[in-house]
Amino acid sequence: MNILGMKLFAHHKGGGSTANGRNSAGRRLGAKAGDGQEIHAGSIIYRQRGTKIHPGKNVGQGGDDTLFALVNGVVKFERLGKYKKQVSVYPAEEAK
């Protein structure tokens, strides 16, 4: 049927679907304390998945690989050989 140049159809084809359209929020990983920063015992230094940075002196590692300070002091990021990095916390009087 053709009325004034328009075609009328009995049905309209479906629009279909897509597999895209989702995204997850970022996990807020990374450094939470900088090199040379004074922190308290129990403070989170670095959030990570796996051991991207290894725990050094006075630093503990949580079940999710988060690094945290065991003592009050100053944060120090250091190289551990050619390819690895570690973070240590030195007591304030020892760091000066």
From Swiss-Prot:
Give the Pfam families listed for this entry: Ribosomal_L27
The record's GO molecular-function terms, alphabetically, read: structural constituent of ribosome
The UniProt entry's GO biological process terms, in alphabetical order, are:
translation
Organism of origin: Lactobacillus acidophilus (strain ATCC 700396 / NCK56 / N2 / NCFM)
* NCBIfam families noted in UniProt: L27 (TIGR00062)
Name listed for the protein in its UniProt record: Large ribosomal subunit protein bL27
- Keyword field contains Ribosomal protein: yes
What PANTHER family does the annotation carry? LARGE RIBOSOMAL SUBUNIT PROTEIN BL27M, RIBOSOMAL PROTEIN L27
Q: Which InterPro entries match?
A: Ribosomal_bL27, Ribosomal_bL27_CS
